[in-house]
UniProtKB/Swiss-Prot annotation:
Originating species: Mus musculus
Segments in the Mitochondrial intermembrane topological domain: 1-5, 68-79, 127-134
Protein name: Translocator protein
Keyword Lyase: no
UniProt xrefs under InterPro entries: TspO/MBR-related_sf, TspO_MBR
Top-rank lineage group of the source organism: Eukaryota
Pfam families: TspO_MBR (PF03073)
Gene3D superfamilies noted in UniProt: TspO/MBR protein
Expression triggers: By dimethyl sulfoxide and diazepam.
Encoding gene per record: Tspo
């Protein structure tokens, strides 16, 4: 039997693993490409993104632990709330490779819309199990709304650079 803190720490850290993998695409050429794009004046400074995502990932990870614990682990009852969570997390992790790697701003926007829908469904499913766990997702939902609008504006304002075009060397 693992120590009681192991599942709490493990499930809290899981979302950050994908965040670290996604960071691979948000560096070097991907970062130079993004810096060259037209962005609205209200886009967040780069230095804010790691603390924002670290907080959001930790909150959702801990929320998943609460749901997991309330439902007795990975049980049949946990299939929908934790399955939705896993689905939104996979869609979330897909965004950096789509946006920064493939430079497909329109597809990245579609991905964010899917993430937002599945994250909303996750929140509703978690609320039936644990309202406090669901509340841990509220800041994430707000950030997804902001990120979706930002992605739309960047896509709209850079329409000639949609198809994954690369900067000239």
């Amino acid at each position: 039997m693992p120590e009681s803190w192991v599942p709490a720490v493990g499930l809290t850290l899981v979302p950050s693993l994908g965040g670290f993998m996604g960071a691979y695409f948000v560096r070097g050429e991907g970062l130079r490409w993004y810096a060259s794009l037209q962005k609205p004046s209200w886009h967040p400074p780069r230095w804010t993104l790691a603390p924002i995502w670290g907080t959001l990932y930790s909150a959702m990870g801990y929320g998943s632990y609460i749901v997991w614990k309330e439902l007795g682990g990975f049980t049949e009852d946990a299939m929908v709330p934790l399955g939705l969570y896993t689905g939104q997390l996979a869609l979330n992790w897909a965004w950096p490779p789509i946006f920064f790697g493939a430079r497909q701003m329109g597809w990245a926007l579609a991905d964010l819309l899917l993430v937002s829908g599945v994250a909303t469904a996750t929140t509703l499913a978690w609320h039936r199990v644990s309202p406090p766990a669901a509340r841990l997702l509220y800041p994430y939902l707000a950030w997804l709304a902001f990120a979706t609008v930002l992605n739309y504006y960047v896509w709209r304002d850079n329409s000639g650079r949609r198809g994954g075009s690369r900067l000239p060397e």
